Amino acid sequence: LMPIVINKREIVTKDVYMKESTKLLEEVVVSAGRFEQKLSDVTVSMDVVKSGDIARQAPTDISSTLRTLPGVDIVDKQPSMRGGSGWTYGVGARSQILVDGMSTLNPKTGEINWNTVPLENVEQVEVIKGASSVLYGSSALNGIINIRTARPGLTPKTRFSAYVGVYGDAENDEYQWSDKSFWKEDKYAVKPILRGSLLSGVRNPIYEGFDLSHSRCIGNFDVSGGINLFTDEGYREQGYNKRFRMGGSLTYHQPDMGMKLLNYGFNVDFLSNQYGDFFIWRSPTEVYKPSPFTN
């Protein structure tokens, strides 16, 4: 701005127009030391995946995104970091999975069910590759995956995404287990909406789903919620997955009165999951069909 000179008993009017400027601040993480730190100050090997990067991949669950990170593998649906063991019967996981700092591992078996992770409301994923048992217990021997859910901003925000996919042909014609007549029999355990309309003539299995989330501030309250619906016929016969998940949170921020502030809130989650799987196939030429002895 140019200097403004005002003489005695003189009134000067000056119009000032301001424009919006956006500046990306340093990323802040909490997993490395259980408190907020700048990513540049963290001394351990750490990757951060933002919600925009996840949305561009259109994954059906968060494990599809994690397997793209260097040093992270998903073996038998369980995470493994830098070649370490993932999950072992009777021992449990060696990579801790957290959602907002709370463990999501099954308390009995120590494994992760990716269907429980609210993909529709993820803000960022923090991945620490390396032992962190001192802070997070024995399950964090190989590393930590901390999934942070989104918090309401200054303006209400609604996100919606829909996706559909078709599995390719089997690598060998002998392995192909489905055709158009198979789906017309209408005897399969799950049936996507598009199977009965737009994709009724497709012989291969399909999957479809949508995510919806909304967040806003109402006075001193933060309100957020999300819904996910996913149907997958599976690339193997009877390897289907049908999922309905919804959840929400309500947080109250105590007004600032010159004292330390406390936040009060609660979360509600609901999951309905119908799925099928097998690990013994029928024959060497029918590897995508379950053995009759597994029923």
Residue ranges and their predicted role:
Residues 232-247, 251-295:
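Flexible loop and strand-edge segments within Gram-negative outer membrane beta-barrel domains
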Residues 152-214, 234-236:
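Short strand-turn segments of transmembrane beta-barrel domains in outer membranes
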Residues 102-129, 148-150, 176-181:
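Short acidic/polar hinge/loop motifs at secondary-structure boundaries
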